[in-house]
Regions:
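The feature captures two recurrent sequence modes
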Residues: 1-92, 100
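Core of folded catalytic or high-affinity ligand/protein-binding domains
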Residues: 70-166
Length: 166
């Protein structure tokens, strides 16, 4: 699995290398994006400042991998997932919404898909943030890289009485 090229920025999908998207892990790709850009997905950063756009694959077939595609969007790279979201094979909305979206895509109407992908982007960002929170080595790595306080370290210092103020 190739990592992001250290000399390229995330403003181009070619920074992800030539490895097919279906061979990659969602979590590893997002970790690479965060390391390269220095921006935490799922935080209080405005949408246009986030380095990538997270989308959901509208296909209703069984997903073969976590990631469907990594492609260059209009302004930033787009990562399309197939394991989570409001619509698609694993979607939370009723099946007829996914079928409606697929029908509209065939007619070159992307409005409903793009509208729901606004919410999918936020849901996927928060999903990644929750995963990171419960994987202590990853959360420690992120906190160290961003020069932020690590939650686990704070709890451990509190247990031995060194974190208390006063």
């Amino acid at each position: 699995m190739s990592e992001l090229s250290r000399d390229k920025k995330i403003d181009d999908a070619r920074a992800f290398g030539d490895t097919p998207a279906t061979w990659r892990s969602f979590y590893q790709v997002i970790r690479d994006v965060e390391q390269r850009s220095g921006v935490k997905l799922g935080s209080d950063v405005r949408f246009e400042k986030e380095p990538v756009r997270l989308l959901v694959d509208a296909e209703s077939t069984f997903p073969v991998a976590e990631l469907a595609k990594i492609r260059q969007g209009v302004t930033k790279p787009e990562i399309e997932v197939s394991f989570f979201g409001l619509f698609g094979a694993s979607g939370a909305l009723p099946k007829h919404y996914s079928l409606l979206i697929l029908d509209r895509i065939k007619q070159k109407d992307y409005a409903l898909r793009d509208f729901l992908n606004i919410f999918n982007h936020r849901l996927l960002s928060l999903f990644y943030r929750a995963w990171e929170k419960h994987h202590f080595p990853i959360s420690f790595e992120t906190a160290t890289r961003l020069k932020d306080k690590d939650r686990v370290q704070q709890v451990l210092w509190s247990l031995i009485g060194l974190q208390t103020g006063g």
